């Protein structure tokens, strides 16, 4: 059997029919699997000494979430070094990266494997891998025929990555036009919710707008901030991180703006704050809702005027910093409650983004599980870590109240448990290895953290919120007005007056 002109033309036509890069990639490997009659095919992108799956056919879905390092996968390292078609003999001692990852064949190892490195000029940009359970499956195809397939795939991948680069740079003046792969941000997911989020990140990354990133705890807001920074013109400069929730009030101002020698006890030398460290770069303020009102006012001034004052210094320093902020709170409610400044909220939320909870991301759970399985494999020195079909179903049926962070911990714990009950360096995760509560059902869809209030205006919304706060305080304190005032941190006389104005008492 050999490739005819019609077969090659058919592959080229399928590439042109695709709508978008992902569809073209999928059409390519699906067609190749049919033409070569193999059990599995995959298109991989090469970056930073690792291969990242872009499209698969005949492999377990979690492969799309895995990241295959050269150090951890000798066959892929051989493909990366070869520069030409690589055929692995059926008795090769090198483990196949897809062993145990062909559905229905989890306990069997791949027998035949061909690797095709993909190049753009002299740069390695990816690889095609072809696997079969029959040892002699690929012997009927010549190296020259496989090189033609590699050329078609390399052209499709090179064009896609170049377009991605140009889009991420927004055709910025000064762009060299030389092909440079986009950096991996570990934002794994193909669900509609994640696809939309990635599009919004691409839109805002090339601008210089401040961004407010909302979402539940554990959804990956820091990864969103990294993706925005990496896709921006500021990517050559630092991304500085500060967790506002971990800042004691006594040192918060110094952490943000720095201090001069002698500004306070213990200030034995001048010290730059996070804003100075992030000059010409990006500052990511995590848990922004935890900042005190006093610090919020000082942060607002920096956003308005672009200058800071170190603690203990009267001089102003100019800084050029893009601010990305994240919160798991509903800042609109915080504004109504008087705990967050409305003017700062509007300064930060020029372009709001919402990171969806894991329960709304469908099959992304399996992709992320694959990513964490591969991490565990490398960390523990195992030859393979795979999910059984039952384990995949179990993960998909769980509600994940702790989101991606909970999934990561669950995978790590399951690998340790499975390893303890099985000899050797191969781990197959079963449903029983996951200590997940059966009674935790998927939570209802979360409303956007920027959902508009149903009231007609700000005053009505504020009064309704105050009314509810007072009712709750009274209920929790047996309708004792003095105790309720203490709980609300207000004077009892002021509470009586406010309640009367709101119609809660005569």
Curated annotation (Swiss-Prot):
Modified residues (4-aspartylphosphate): 57
Gene Ontology MF annotations: ATP binding; ATP hydrolysis activity; cis-regulatory region sequence-specific DNA binding; DNA-binding transcription activator activity
PROSITE patterns (alphabetical): SIGMA54_INTERACT_1 (PS00675), SIGMA54_INTERACT_2 (PS00676), SIGMA54_INTERACT_3 (PS00688), SIGMA54_INTERACT_4 (PS50045)
DNA-binding segment(s): 481-500
UniProt keywords, alphabetically: ATP-binding, DNA-binding, Nucleotide-binding, Phosphoprotein, Transcription, Transcription regulation
Name of the protein in question: Anaerobic nitric oxide reductase transcription regulator NorR
Recorded metabolic or biological pathway in which this protein acts: Nitrogen metabolism; nitric oxide reduction
Gene3D superfamilies in the cross-refs: 1.10.8.60, 3.30.450.40, Homeodomain-like, P-loop containing nucleotide triphosphate hydrolases
Domain Sigma-54 factor interaction, chain residue ranges per copy: 187-416
Gene Ontology biological-process entries: phosphorelay signal transduction system; positive regulation of DNA-templated transcription
Primary role: Required for the expression of anaerobic nitric oxide (NO) reductase, acts as a transcriptional activator for at least the norVW operon. Activation also requires sigma-54.
Top-level taxon in the UniProt lineage: Bacteria
Cited InterPro entries: AAA+_ATPase, GAF, GAF-like_dom_sf, Homeodomain-like_sf, NorR, P-loop_NTPase, Sigma_54_int, Sigma_54_int_dom_ATP-bd_1
GO cellular component, one term: protein-DNA complex
Pfam families with a match to the protein in the record: GAF (PF01590), Sigma54_activat (PF00158)
Regions crossing the membrane: none
HAMAP family hit by this protein: NorR
Binding residues for ATP: 215-222, 278-287
């Amino acid at each position: 059997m050999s490739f005819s002109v019609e077969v090659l033309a058919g592959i080229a036509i399928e590439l042109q029919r695709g709508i978008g890069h992902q569809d073209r990639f999928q059409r390519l490997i699906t067609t190749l699997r049919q033409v070569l009659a193999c059990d599995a095919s995959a298109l991989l992108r090469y970056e930073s000494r690792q291969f990242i799956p872009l499209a698969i056919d005949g492999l377990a879905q979690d492969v799309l979430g895995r990241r295959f390092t050269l150090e951890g996968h000798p066959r892929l390292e051989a493909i990366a070094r070869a520069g030409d078609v690589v055929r692995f003999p059926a008795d090769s001692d090198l483990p196949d990266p897809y062993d145990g990852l062909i559905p229905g064949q989890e306990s069997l190892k791949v027998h035949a494997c061909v690797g095709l490195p993909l190049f753009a000029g002299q740069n390695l940009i990816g690889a095609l891998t072809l696997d079969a359970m029959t040892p002699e499956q690929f012997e009927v195809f010549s190296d020259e025929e496989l090189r033609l397939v590699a050329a078609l795939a390399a052209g499709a991948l090179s064009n896609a990555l170049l377009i991605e680069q140009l889009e991420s740079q927004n055709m910025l003046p000064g762009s060299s036009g030389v092909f440079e792969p986009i950096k991996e941000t570990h934002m794994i997911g193909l669900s509609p919710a994640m696809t939309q989020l990635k599009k919004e990140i691409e839109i805002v990354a090339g601008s210089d707008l401040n961004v407010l990133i909302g979402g539940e705890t554990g959804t990956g807001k820091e990864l969103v901030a990294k993706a925005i920074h990496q896709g921006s013109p500021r990517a050559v400069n630092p991304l500085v991180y500060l967790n506002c929730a971990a800042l004691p009030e006594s040192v918060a101002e110094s952490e943000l703006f720095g201090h001069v020698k002698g500004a306070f006890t213990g200030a034995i030398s001048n010290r730059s704050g996070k804003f100075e460290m992030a000059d010409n770069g990006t500052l990511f303020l995590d848990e922004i809702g935890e900042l005190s009102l006093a610090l919020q006012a000082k942060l607002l001034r920096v956003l308005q005027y672009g200058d800071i004052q170190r603690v203990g210094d009267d001089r102003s320093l100019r800084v050029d910093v893009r601010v990305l902020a994240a919160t798991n709170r509903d800042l609109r409610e915080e504004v109504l409650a008087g705990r967050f400044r409305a003017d700062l909220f509007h300064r930060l939320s020029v372009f709001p983004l919402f990171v969806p909870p894991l329960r709304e991301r469908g099959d992304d759970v399996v992709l992320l599980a694959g990513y964490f399985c591969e991490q565990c494999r490398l960390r523990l020195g195992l030859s393979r870590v795979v999910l059984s079909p039952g384990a995949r179903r179990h993960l998909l049926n769980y509600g994940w109240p702790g989101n991606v962070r909970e999934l990561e911990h669950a995978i790590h714990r399951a690998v340790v448990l499975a390893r303890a009950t099985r000899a050797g360096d191969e781990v197959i995760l079963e449903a029983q290895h996951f200590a997940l509560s059966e009674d935790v059902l998927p939570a209802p869809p979360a409303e956007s953290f920027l959902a508009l209030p149903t009231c007609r205006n700000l005053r009505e919304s504020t009064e309704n919120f105050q009314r509810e706060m007072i009712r709750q305080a009274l209920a929790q304190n047996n309708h004792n007005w003095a105790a309720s005032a203490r709980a609300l941190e207000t004077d009892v006389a002021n509470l009586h007056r406010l309640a009367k104005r709101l119609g809660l008492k005569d």
